[in-house]
UniProtKB/Swiss-Prot annotation:
Residues carrying Phosphothreonine: 811
Record function comment: Acts as a component of the MCM2-7 complex (MCM complex) which is the putative replicative helicase essential for 'once per cell cycle' DNA replication initiation and elongation in eukaryotic cells. Core component of CDC45-MCM-GINS (CMG) helicase, the molecular machine that unwinds template DNA during replication, and around which the replisome is built.
Additional record remark: Present with 166 molecules/cell in log phase SD medium. Early fractionation of eukaryotic MCM proteins yielded a variety of dimeric, trimeric and tetrameric complexes with unclear biological significance. Specifically a MCM467 subcomplex is shown to have in vitro helicase activity which is inhibited by the MCM2 subunit. The MCM2-7 hexamer is the proposed physiological active complex.
All residue ranges annotated as the MCM domain in the record: 410-617
Span of the annotated motif Arginine finger: 592-595
Catalysed reaction equations from the record: ATP + H2O = ADP + phosphate + H(+)
Main subcellular location: cytoplasm
Protein name: DNA replication licensing factor MCM7
Protein family membership: Belongs to the MCM family.
Binding site for ATP 1: 423, 463, 465-467, 568
Entry GO terms, CC: chromosome, telomeric region; CMG complex; cytoplasm; DNA replication preinitiation complex; MCM complex; MCM core complex; nuclear pre-replicative complex; nuclear replication fork
Amino acid sequence: MSAALPSIQLPVDYNNLFNEITDFLVTFKQDTLSSDATRNENEDENLDAENIEQHLLEKGPKYMAMLQKVANRELNSVIIDLDDILQYQNEKFLQGTQADDLVSAIQQNANHFTELFCRAIDNNMPLPTKEIDYKDDVLDVILNQRRLRNERMLSDRTNEIRSENLMDTTMDPPSSMNDALREVVEDETELFPPNLTRRYFLYFKPLSQNCARRYRKKAISSKPLSVRQIKGDFLGQLITVRGIITRVSDVKPAVEVIAYTCDQCGYEVFQEVNSRTFTPLSECTSEECSQNQTKGQLFMSTRASKFSAFQECKIQELSQQVPVGHIPRSLNIHVNGTLVRSLSPGDIVDVTGIFLPAPYTGFKALKAGLLTETYLEAQFVRQHKKKFASFSLTSDVEERVMELITSGDVYNRLAKSIAPEIYGNLDVKKALLLLLVGGVDKRVGDGMKIRGDINVCLMGDPGVAKSQLLKAICKISPRGVYTTGKGSSGVGLTAAVMKDPVTDEMILEGGALVLADNGICCIDEFDKMDESDRTAIHEVMEQQTISISKAGINTTLNARTSILAAANPLYGRYNPRLSPLDNINLPAALLSRFDILFLMLDIPSRDDDEKLAEHVTYVHMHNKQPDLDFTPVEPSKMREYIAYAKTKRPVMSEAVNDYVVQAYIRLRQDSKREMDSKFSFGQATPRTLLGIIRLSQALAKLRLADMVDIDDVEEALRLVRVSKESLYQETNKSKEDESPTTKIFTIIKKMLQETGKNTLSYENIVKTVRLRGFTMLQLSNCIQEYSYLNVWHLINEGNTLKFVDDGTMDTDQEDSLVSTPKLAPQTTASANVSAQDSDIDLQDA
């Protein structure tokens, strides 16, 4: 027979701690400076900001104001901030009063202190300051019925005493009546469990980083832990875990208190449930049934029972937390009360909770022996990246947004701030910025929906930073999912049927596209996907839904996501001998769903290669990008600006509509003329028109405008044209070296040949040239340079352009004008400088 373990007495006086908790709740007042510091540091998770504002205005105790709102049914959660307790302890220390280390005690035994705080709150709960109808809640109805029953019991007891001549009707009630009243009141207080009458959920908020640094005792680490670092000595303690949420169950009702009704005496019997399993009561335990020796049968009263929202989540280690050669570990999280639905799959979070064991029950207990499962009972959640929809547009956020606008050139600055360590690719970064902002969703009266999300495909040679751009977008986007084509199946992208471990029901587990709802799904190695898996994306890219019919489940899931795909051409590298469609090797049905398709070619160029090599070597040497001519915008500020821009819903005026229609007709005609050429990209489809509209709306959002301007449409057309022109190489090498001035001259000369006259309207020239993606500065330089060469002149106060030789010149003269850079050196130099200073980055045709 084994000897008993020695008993020890812990030096913990819980009565003294309970008195300190009561004093803290009643007397604590938060100073303005500390509350502002806490709000600035924890701006994302300020759940009780309204209560802080209220008590600061009233200059009263913070938690008593919070309890008053609980009593008035305006608040259903009480958040105990450990920063406030630490401030309370410091104030007691400065006053010369020795107080126990309450913060350390809560961190080491959080589960027990939850009950202590609840008892202190119950004892100090104020009366409601507004009238509350007893019909509002089921518990109010039960309490009201119990109060009426007690009054009847008192009346019956009074009549019984009078009938027994124990008192005279003219005399005051004797002590027996007071004793009977006291017994009835005590029975009422003992009848209802404390957990049944509580109308709030209590949570602990961990120490902030500033307070944790100043905290003298480091018994519990305030830094977030990985799942691998959680050991057995953390059981019962308040810890913080950092990871990514991989699975979230449905919200189910979890029973806390079960109410039974006896069929003999009519009494209510309550049973508290503190575990996952329980044994229902069957026999009545009331005093009346015991005295009458009648075994009344209990029937469960579901309406009088108390249920709370329950959700089970699974958190997994981040990739940087996993050692070499290991697989990520995971931990179950139990979420109760008002914290449910605060976690979503794919979120990177810091979850503060109580680390508790869950012993095996049933047959598992016989096999597992002393082993137990562990879980984290969530107390507080801090999101690393807030969703765009959950951004609170406070005055501080608006001030930072306006500061960014006043700095000027927001469009180019934000685009350059996307992965500044990656050299060049400014137009690609501009398209990715518009993808982050998105267009405007439209819903027609008959229910048809027009998507506003923008889809972009990056196709190019290996080593041009496609994957790095994808990961940069995932980092900036609050809800970004990164996956690869070969490592993803159709089920992994859409949804899979699996068994719920909580309820053992068949449920749908969302894939990458569902997890990226209201976000961005980045798919790398898009060309390596199987054709059967790639077809699952067709519905998502246009209809933004996923239709599922499997395992008896017929439903439609939302996948309101933007697709950012990266792919390599056929045979790995771009082959200039093949047409662009052959190089791209994607079906036309999928190709037309992309608003922009960039081809990023790795073309040898001495100047570009030298700049790229210098950039890469500098990054390797200093672990940062070279000094830029601007200050990159931080990802957090960029998210705030994009969230602010997403609140705008710009519309198009009649003039802009006509301009878009004419531009689309010209695109269709150009694609029709190029259909027979070797370098044809394909037919321009109506989806191209919708893509131009979405890009224009995104540009208007970036300007924080309510109307789409013609300049927005022109920039969208320029991006579309640049993306189209980058899909093929010109066979004539000399055309690649043409300056913008020469290209504009070619366009005007072609217009002259089509009209057959020697004059052109300056307004038509401006419209055509800007439609081709050139700026007014470049057009002005072109007209000035060729006027100096006596090729044309502006007449009629600048409204008409007239050719000197009736537009007819021989081939030798034309070639000399186009290819002679030495004429008018000052004008040419000024044109080149102006082109470099232009906001629009031109690509070679």
